[in-house]
């Protein structure tokens, strides 16, 4: 296709030799150079990277390659181009339109600082006060909120002050907890320095005895939205932490879905005495399921079977004790085959501390089995599906959960740590806005939330100082397709 003269006239000349190509109805600019071809005895054209695109309305719009060149070359003699990370920030704001209003309602004087640091935390992985200002100045947030103080000392003071506002933080979170909802809990251990008063010796799921605090997180089952959290000492027993956190949410008639390791007779009694409904996963070596049940290879031992994702899941339900509790046991044959395959492969390659033979897999009679204790007398499929949603949450939570420890290591006081915990919570709210949008548009099968964040981080807002205002850098076709499906318009404010 011939390139229109109006497009050719907008070809940038400051980069040296460049040519315009028509691809898919759009006009892209590529760097070109010549290289001597000794075989042909003449110069040969070599096409380099694309540096942007040209439109009739906006002229040349640089992409990431073009922006780097512009910064290196200082295109204008007096004013360097102003480049801001834009795409991911604007996308997250558009996907969470109500969050601004909620923050403004409960934190009218500081909601912009909370929003800004939380977004920097999510998009750029910021985990300490000293890294906030550099990321802020490079981001679109510095244009939105250019008057807020983001120096290291200012950020430290702000976070510590935020940590003293726990009552207001709780009210903000309680507004998200609906009566009669099903709540899922996730407890993560946070390692701190030994001098921090919040930290105390206590076992975490990895059996370390380092100084630690625990953040007990509460998620709403159906939306997967994080709605509440509580910071507790590592030495406080889970029973006390659970009951205190449930009371703090203000939720009535809730169903508690806990993480593995919480089950014990004492904890069950505490939940029953508090009048709470619960679903508690049991350890693989639980005594609540008879050994002979695992050894019995006859599928007639099961009550029935249902399908999940086109694979069979067998179940057995039986009463436990005299207080209305039930044990629900399931076997996922797909998971069983997967675990057996891993065991055999490890044995063949000699992995592991103990020497094992592939045929030893026959001794692993509990593979693919998992059980729960609950005081709900319901169809076993409901128990399975409820906890399956919790597994999904665990996978998603890992994105921020893995970096919480880094944030905590910079906490010099209890108030500072609590302030970071709340900023992390707001980051999670933005993250789940993206996650739920991917689910609703059926894009989650192709792209994770992390994938989309990485793609949109490469979209910039550029002001070359030509008096025509900022422009959005070129957007890859794949990325634009994702944004269109999510209903995101990155040009709406430009």
Residue locations for each model-derived region?
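Extended, well-ordered alpha-helical scaffold/bundle regions in very large, multi-domain proteins
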Residues: 138-162, 398, 402-472
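Dynamic "connector" segments at or just before major functional cores
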Residues: 1-184, 189-194, 217-230, 243, ...
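Acidic, metal-coordinating catalytic cores used for nucleic-acid/nucleotide bond scission
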Residues: 257-266, 284-287, 416
